[in-house]
Each structure stands twice: as structure tokens, then as C-alpha cells.
């Protein structure tokens, strides 16, 4: 998944369900991901959200909330030894989430929220900032700089090496293409990699926002295609949501891959990496 520019020793893999449905569901997915977590070429993180605060409909399932959600993620961390990623939507969540999570993620819709970025950057967690669907990839350097200057006030401009050293990553998840659709401009991977390590979110990139009568739809069959293309361009890691039963998932089921599908995809991406 990486080109020779990358200084990280392994390819990052971030995988898990969209939202915490139950502890039993988390365990069932975590077990299926063990072969990938044990792959020596991968730096693996288990992900899940304790709250999906930007669901289309008020009636949509959001998750167990901050307290119960973090307890369940801590259980997965203890039982499986996995490092954890979760996202935060409000500044007050950062310090509590950082006690459990190794990576705190800024959602795409909030990638310009200065107070949130600063609060997350004051923790010891890696910060993964998702590029907004509305953002010019070049302008993401300013979000990176907010985080970097919070961690080291002497930094004047963002570079790949400085962002890597200070644990500030970016994540590409597609750009708005008319109403209810996204497209991935692969040029953004190279552009953003000039000033930060870049993770490619293969499953949210195939989302169709708000395209299913009060909820988002998508087409997961395109996720492997985009992921392999991103690996060829050069990325630092892959983000992919996975579920043992995507059709019955409580959020983003149309975009998610089954664990065995993800395993095959990662194998392909590592082969592509060997070409560079």
C-alpha cells in the first residue's frame, strides 16, 4: 500500500464495524479479523463508533453512547490486544476517548472544526482527520497545521515527515459528485501526501449519502476496485468497514465488506505494494 516515500515501517489497516451494535457483535467481527491483525506486514487497528452523530434521520440507530461504547471498546482491546480507533464529534469527548483509543478520528463533516481538532491534538492519540466531501485536498494542509501547531507551536508548515512524527494523518473518503453520490479523485492521495500520511477509506468512498429514503446507501462491490487503485497511487494505509452480516448491519451495511472479502483485498493490495 506504500511507495518508497513512506517512512512508516508497516502498512496501516483500520477495520471494524461502522457502529457498535453490541459487545457480542464486536467480538464476532474481532475474531474474524485476527488473521489480518496477526499479519506482520500490517499495523492493525480495530475501529468502531460509539455514536454516529450525523445520521440522516432522527430515527436511525446511533450507537450505545460515549460511556458504554468506550467500555466495550476497552473490552475488545483487553481480550484481543488490538489497538483501537474511534471517532469523536464534540470536544468534550476527546479526553475520555483517548484513554481507550490509540487513534482519534475527526469525521469528514467536521474536518475544519478548530476547537475539535485542537482538543483531540492535546491528547496523546494519533489524530486521523477525514477529508470533507466538500474539501479541496490541498486545503487539508490547514487542518493538519492546526493539529501540528497544537502539538508543537514551533512548526510553521506541514510536511509529511513532521506530520508522521507528530501522529497527524489524513483520510480520503471521496468527494461529492452531484446529489447523493461520491467520486474519488486519485490525485488527492498524492496531493495530501505532500503534507501528511494518507489513509484511504475504501468503504465510505462508495457511499451514496442520503440516497435511500432517510438513510445512506452505497455499493460495496466498488470498494476493492478503488482500494487497489489507491494502493497503486501510493498510500500509507487502508480504512475499511467490515461486518459479519452487512445486509443486517445497523449503519452503512451497503458499503461494508465481509471479513473474508477484506482479507482477499488486503492480500491484493500488499502484492501491488511489492511493485514499488
UniProtKB/Swiss-Prot annotation:
Q: Which reaction does it catalyse?
A: D-arabinose 5-phosphate + phosphoenolpyruvate + H2O = 3-deoxy-alpha-D-manno-2-octulosonate-8-phosphate + phosphate
> Where is it chiefly localized?
cytoplasm
Check the record and name the Pfam families matching this protein.
Answer: DAHP_synth_1 (PF00793)
Q: So, what pathway does this thing act in?
A: Carbohydrate biosynthesis; 3-deoxy-D-manno-octulosonate biosynthesis; 3-deoxy-D-manno-octulosonate from D-ribulose 5-phosphate: step 2/3; Bacterial outer membrane biogenesis; lipopolysaccharide biosynthesis
Instruction: List, alphabetically, the GO terms of the cellular component aspect.
Output: cytoplasm
Transferase recorded as keyword: yes
- Is Transferase among this UniProt entry's keywords? yes
For this protein, the record's InterPro entries field holds: Aldolase_TIM (IPR013785), DAHP1/KDSA (IPR006218), KDO8P_synthase (IPR006269)
**Gene Ontology molecular function, alphabetical:** 3-deoxy-8-phosphooctulonate synthase activity
Superkingdom: Bacteria
Biological processes per GO annotation: keto-3-deoxy-D-manno-octulosonic acid biosynthetic process
Q: Which HAMAP family match?
A: KDO8P_synth
Q: Its family?
A: Belongs to the KdsA family.
What is the name listed in the Swiss-Prot or TrEMBL entry for this protein?
Answer: 2-dehydro-3-deoxyphosphooctonate aldolase
Species, as recorded? Helicobacter pylori (strain Shi470)
**Phylogenetic placement of the source organism:** Bacteria, Pseudomonadati, Campylobacterota, Epsilonproteobacteria, Campylobacterales
The primary gene name is: kdsA
Amino acid at each position: 500500500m506504500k511507495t518508497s516515500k513512506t517512512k512508516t515501517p508497516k502498512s496501516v489497516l483500520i477495520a471494524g464495524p461502522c457502529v457498535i451494535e453490541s459487545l457480542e457483535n464486536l467480538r464476532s467481527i474481532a475474531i474474524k479479523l485476527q488473521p489480518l491483525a496477526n499479519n506482520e506486514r500490517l499495523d492493525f487497528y480495530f475501529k468502531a463508533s460509539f455514536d454516529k452523530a450525523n445520521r440522516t434521520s432522527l430515527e436511525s440507530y446511533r450507537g450505545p453512547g460515549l460511556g458504554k461504547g468506550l467500555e466495550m471498546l476497552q473490552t475488545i482491546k483487553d481480550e484481543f490486544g488490538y489497538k483501537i480507533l474511534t471517532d469523536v464529534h464534540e470536544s468534550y469527548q476527546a479526553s475520555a476517548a483517548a484513554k481507550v483509543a490509540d487513534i482519534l478520528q475527526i469525521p469528514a463533516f467536521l474536518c475544519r472544526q478548530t476547537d475539535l481538532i485542537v482538543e483531540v491534538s492535546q491528547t496523546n492519540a494519533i489524530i486521523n482527520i477525514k477529508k470533507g466531501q466538500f474539501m479541496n485536498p490541498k486545503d487539508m494542509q490547514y487542518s493538519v497545521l492546526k493539529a501540528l501547531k497544537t502539538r508543537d507551536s514551533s512548526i510553521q508548515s506541514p510536511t509529511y515527515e513532521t506530520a508522521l512524527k507528530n501522529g497527524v494523518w489524513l483520510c480520503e473518503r471521496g468527494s461529492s459528485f452531484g446529489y447523493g453520490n461520491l467520486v474519488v479523485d486519485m490525485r488527492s492521495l498524492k496531493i495530501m501526501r505532500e503534507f501528511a500520511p494518507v489513509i484511504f477509506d475504501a468503504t465510505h468512498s462508495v457511499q451514496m449519502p442520503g440516497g435511500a429514503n432517510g438513510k445512506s446507501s452505497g455499493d460495496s462491490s466498488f470498494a476493492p476496485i478503488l482500494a487497489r487503485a489507491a494502493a497503486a497511487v501510493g498510500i500509507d494505509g487502508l480504512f475499511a468497514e467490515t461486518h459479519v452480516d452487512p445486509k443486517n448491519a445497523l449503519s452503512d451495511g451497503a458499503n461494508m465488506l465481509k471479513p473474508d472479502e477484506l482479507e482477499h483485498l488486503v492480500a491484493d493490495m500488499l502484492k501491488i505494494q511489492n511493485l514499488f
